[in-house]
Amino acid sequence: MELDRDKKTFAYFWLFGLINNILYVVILSAASDIIGPSLPKSIVLLFDIMPSFLIKLSAPFFVHSIHYDKRIPILILLSMLGIILVSTRSLWLCLPGIVLASLSSGFGEITFLQLTHFFGSKSLTGWSSGTGGAGIVGSFSYLLLTTVFRLNIQLSLLLYAALPLIFLLYYKINDSIVSSQVYQSLDMPIDSSDGPIELLKSNGWVDIVKRLSKLVIPYMIPLSTVYLFEYLINQGVAPTLLFPIDTTPFVKYRDIYVTYGTLYQLGVFISRTWGHKLPVKNLYLFSVLQLINLLITLSQSYYYWTDSISWIMVLIFYEGLIGGSSYVNCFMNILKDVDPNEREFVLGSVSISDSLGTLIAAFLGIILEPSLCKHQIGTGRPWCRME
């Protein structure tokens, strides 16, 4: 019975992770199609991450007042409306659509990470694997629809609008997988005098800031720097990691960019699914390894020291492995090391870190990609301006 419940817990949270992150991934995969080759892809990243970061940053001060049951319809509405606007391919409608989808993704990550406090390690491994699965399913399905099947880009994006309805499975949790003890925890009134929710309400903003400050060195800095380095690669450098199209297996240069995204997400999926089997206590190891990857890709973009796309594809895949491992180990360490009375708060709060690193990368990438592209054009490599 316990084993069966564990399997269902994993399955439900895998789906929640998949759906929560898939639109974020699809939007990044479609960056070159949304804004074209002449603008930095980091503009899309900026709009895809800024709202998510802001809601995560402010959530510790208000999220306790919204019951989990009420959060799900909000996530569904924001996601569906967001991707519908993005599918119009009109830049001035796409950007607000990206903002709505980003709000849903950030609020969803807080919600489901906090729920893992009640459901334990199986829910966290399911969520982590599902978010990794969102990467590979989102990027590969978009690659398949637009590059292999050559489906209309507007229709391809619109097909994703129905996926957020899968969040409705949340309402089956109590009937399917929750023991009576967890059931009581989830269904208690939001203003109950028990548990971490009331502790949060009774503390002032100063106390909340103090609690957040304790998370900076062990969890937030290593996670945010890993995301900073990998998204600088993905959005600032990868669009310039190009080769003569006749030396590659691709038809268009935008196909190279989409393929890089798919390889990265494959690495993320593998490490988020199985990374917990190789536990790492010192999270700064991942920061160092990802910095090395950034330096290697920067040198390739600037100096063009190899004319083999295969080596770069392997490196992008490895970059994804590092990023996914950092994420799953960070939250696994929290489940193991943090006091249960603080765990729900910590799980929701540390998710600020990945968005912060990605947000900084978006700002830097807006400068970095055009600079690298300008240098390449000046040295006889004009591919970054070609479709």
From Swiss-Prot:
Endoplasmic reticulum in keyword set: no
Domain of life: Eukaryota
Keyword field: Amino-acid transport, Membrane, Signal, Transmembrane, Transmembrane helix, Transport, Vacuole
UniProt-recorded name of the protein: Protein BTN1
Family: Belongs to the battenin family.
Listed InterPro entries: Battenin_disease_Cln3, Battenin_disease_Cln3_subgr, MFS_trans_sf
Cellular compartment(s): Vacuole membrane
GO cellular component, one term: vacuolar membrane
Membrane topology, record value: Multi-pass membrane protein
Transmembrane is among the record's keywords: yes
Pfam families in alphabetical order: CLN3
GO biological process, one term: amino acid transport
